[in-house]
Design a protein with these regions (language model features):
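Catalytic-core regions of core metabolic enzymes
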Residues: 1-314
Length: 314
């Protein structure tokens, strides 16, 4: 595919990890270990203000100490440090950032103010953001595992995009047991910048992606989202599960990632109109992933149903 404006997120030639650490089971330790063990094919730099080395690699106290340009940074440091990090990244010419750190819009007034600082700094330097409050991003074909998920993932042709990091972890664990691989795994978190529509725009033209699964808690930019879903569904199967079918679910989603959850019947009608399949449960989403992983795509109306009763076949 040609150079997409989100290439720095999905195909970075260099990555720096803020908060990379030797402290066992810390988020920074797991992220950097994943990057090393999954065989990332680009340049990799740990940034740690206290240590000269991290996991056997030379560490840098600041991004300004790195002579080479950095396309993507992964941030796993306390929330108060993130606005300053984004500012420093902008001065260094960074194109994209994955903010794993939580404690922003979902954490009350102080977190909302901090999130605003991060967004303003990113906009000043045209840095695109995934997160905050997310698991991270994976591109197995290039060894990019910028997540704190314990365990890898096989390369495949399914893209999975989710606002829930916990659900990402669950489906990745399940996929390993069921031999299902992924072209991309994107944990959106609070989706303060890059949204579902932009991710779909990338995936629809990605030759490694043959089908797309999504877990949605809420949509911020409905018009661009529906346009992107319509374009994607014309070319590739798109299957999603969305919470908020009931009032209690909508309230829980709002408190989880500060998402805006719209009227469910309106969403249902819109999804159906653009040709996207909505499933009702997480189990059904897992089943869809297994079905899509086989690579078989029926064409036309030559489908036979074998059943031991009339009801199940209707």
């Amino acid at each position: 595919m040609g150079k997409h404006y989100l290439n720095s997120l999905f195909a970075p030639k260099s990555v720096a990890v803020f908060g990379a650490s030797d402290r066992i089971d810390s988020v920074g330790q797991i992220v950097f270990k994943n990057m090393l063990e999954c065989g990332y094919k680009g340049l990799l730099y740990p940034i740690n203000t206290k240590n000269a080395t991290v996991q056997g690699q030379r560490a840098y106290a600041a991004i300004a100490d790195i002579a080479e340009p950095i396309e993507l940074v992964v941030i796993a440091t306390p929330p108060q440090s993130v606005p300053g990090i984004i500012e420093a990244c902008g001065l260094h010419g960074v194109k994209a950032a994955v903010i794993i750190t939580a404690g922003f819009g979902e954490a009350g007034a102080a977190g909302i103010a901090l999130e605003k600082e991060v967004i303003e700094a990113a906009h000043r330097y045209n840095i695109r953001l995934i997160g905050p409050n997310c698991l991270g991003i994976m591109r197995p074909s290039i060894g990019l595992n910028a997540t704190f998920n314990k365990g890898g993932v096989n390369a495949g042709n399914i893209a999975f995009v989710s606002q829930s990091g916990a659900l990402c972890t669950a489906i990745l664990d399940w996929a390993q047991r069921n031999d299902v691989g992924f072209s991309s795994v994107v944990s959106m978190g609070s989706s303060t910048d890059v949204d579902f529509g932009e991710i779909l725009d990338y995936l629809v033209s990605d030759p490694n992606t043959h089908s797309i699964l999504m877990y949605i808690e809420g949509i911020r930019h409905a018009r661009s989202f529906m346009s992107a879903m319509r374009a994607a569904a014309r070319i590739k199967p798109v299957i999603l599960v969305k919470v908020g079918r009931h009032a209690s679910g909508s309230k829980a989603a709002m408190s989880h990632t500060a998402s805006l959850v719209g009227a469910d019947d309106v969403f249902d009608a819109a999804v159906s109109r653009v040709g996207v399949v909505r499933v009702q449960t997480i189990t059904q989403l897992f089943t869809a992933a297994k079905a899509l992983s086989c690579g078989f795509r029926p064409v036309g109306n030559r489908l036979a149903i074998v059943t031991n009763g009339g009801g199940p076949g209707v």
